């Protein structure tokens, strides 16, 4: 029996060291060298170097002077990241969409883009389609006292055009550019 136990325990110890320590350390080291920004969470910093969020996680922006993100089913908390899991035919979803549209977008003209009223699959998608940003442009321009044309330049610069899929705008990056152009604190 010792002939079987000793090699088995040796293998367990060896694999524990390799897969529990050496492999994770090697992957972390390679990631830090090859992709330091992504390995550390794609953190977004302001002009003072302070972390303002991650380029991969949506944030809530309140007030007319900011472009709004998609709604979040988990209150923008990464721990509670999830979709609402409500089907399009669910009356609770219809009521929430109706309430959100009335509360946030009642003063604006035309139908509210779907992306501004529905949560994403993760509940934390940081991107919006350019149409959803364009819908918010008049409100933000009025609040910041900046022309819509100047804001449209910011939107065009912030629009990502992936190889596959439609163009999207990272709301955090756009709001940071907006703050550099026309700081809200100065108003």
From Swiss-Prot:
Keyword check for Ion transport: yes
Residues that span the membrane, as ranges: 11-31
Topology class, membrane: Single-pass membrane protein
Superkingdom to which the source organism belongs: Bacteria
GO cellular component, as recorded: plasma membrane
Subcellular location: Cell inner membrane
Pfam families: KdpC
Main localization (coarse): membrane
Recorded GO MF terms: ATP binding; P-type potassium transmembrane transporter activity
Sorted UniProt keywords: ATP-binding, Cell inner membrane, Cell membrane, Ion transport, Membrane, Nucleotide-binding, Potassium, Potassium transport, Transmembrane, Transmembrane helix, Transport
Family in the record: Belongs to the KdpC family.
Subunit structure as annotated in this protein's UniProt entry: The system is composed of three essential subunits: KdpA, KdpB and KdpC.
Role description: Part of the high-affinity ATP-driven potassium transport (or Kdp) system, which catalyzes the hydrolysis of ATP coupled with the electrogenic transport of potassium into the cytoplasm. This subunit acts as a catalytic chaperone that increases the ATP-binding affinity of the ATP-hydrolyzing subunit KdpB by the formation of a transient KdpB/KdpC/ATP ternary complex.
Listed name of the protein: Potassium-transporting ATPase KdpC subunit
Organism of derivation: Pseudomonas entomophila (strain L48)
